[in-house]
Amino acid sequence: MAKGKGVRIVVTLECKTDQGVYRYHTTKNRRNTPNRIELKKYCPLTQQHEIFKEIK
């Protein structure tokens, strides 16, 4: 029997400064964070920490 949708989903984070160039993949709990997340991660293109925003 198949179960329903899980609580955790895989999301893609994209750099706001270099859009479409570098992305991270991570999971989030859809109950705790229903809105789009923004995380500060390392961008190897700019060689510094940048804000990465969740995309569809």
UniProtKB/Swiss-Prot annotation:
It comes from the Eukaryota. NCBIfam families: PRK00504.1, PRK00595.1, rpmG_bact. Signal peptide: none annotated. GO terms for cellular component: chloroplast; ribonucleoprotein complex; ribosome. Belongs to the bacterial ribosomal protein bL33 family. PROSITE patterns: RIBOSOMAL_L33. Keywords: Chloroplast, Plastid, Ribonucleoprotein, Ribosomal protein. InterPro entries: Ribosomal_bL33, Ribosomal_bL33_CS, Ribosomal_bL33_sf, Ribosomal_zn-bd. Transmembrane segments: none annotated. The lineage of its organism: Eukaryota, Cryptophyceae, Pyrenomonadales, Geminigeraceae, Guillardia. It holds the Pfam family Ribosomal_L33. One of its GO terms (molecular function) is structural constituent of ribosome. GO terms for biological process: translation. The keyword Plastid applies. SUPFAM superfamilies: Zn-binding ribosomal proteins. It is found in: Plastid, Chloroplast. The keyword Ribonucleoprotein applies. This is Large ribosomal subunit protein bL33c. The gene is rpl33.
